[in-house]
Amino acid sequence: MARYTGPKSKIARKFGDPIFGADKVLSKKNYPPGQHGNNRRRKTSEYGLQLREKQKAKYTYGVLEKQFRHLFHRAQRAKGVTGELLIQFLEARLDNVVFRLGIAPTRSAARQLVSHRHITVDGSVVNIPSYSVKPGQVIGVRERSKSLEVIADALTGFNHSKYPWMEWDQSSLSGKLLHMPDRTDIPENIKEQLIVELYSK
């Protein structure tokens, strides 16, 4: 499946959750898209709920099936709670870290910044959105990219104390992943246990 590039409000309505950020359409039409979306509330099967939660996580983080499955198997092999580790690994993706630091307004925009070589890790350019950031690594904006309007606009008024597992230095336009976040600190409304159950079948 290719990465979705269509109307984001339609996907947000599908899940009944603003997975791409604040959504004016969702606030007015918080029911599935389609002609009869507001009246069609069929009971969803257990498998359907599990699949829906996986799709929701993939859309939220902008991850394709192969990448998502790889992260799940990595979480399975690691020591700890598989579902929580999966969410932590998704959070540690470079594109997500760039988004969380406020360098980009959305994960999609963050992915573009990384792909177009505007982002550095420990001083070296990294253009792989799926790169896994480790605690202690410094994520910065490339010197020649610091004047980009999209970055300046995103950083304006951004609350850098929002995510306690990160640190930001405005003078150098760089931030650091201090530690992996606790699941309770991650605001995404994802029921990761349903994803674990789906892959465990």
UniProtKB/Swiss-Prot annotation:
Disulfide bonds: none
One GO location term (cellular component): small ribosomal subunit
The S4 RNA-binding domain, residue ranges: 92-154
SMART domains: Ribosomal_S4, S4
Gene3D superfamilies (UniProt xref): Ribosomal Protein S4 Delta 41, Chain A, domain 1, RNA-binding S4 domain
Residue segments, region Disordered: 26-47
Entry similarity comment: Belongs to the universal ribosomal protein uS4 family.
Protein name as catalogued: Small ribosomal subunit protein uS4
UniProt gene name: rpsD
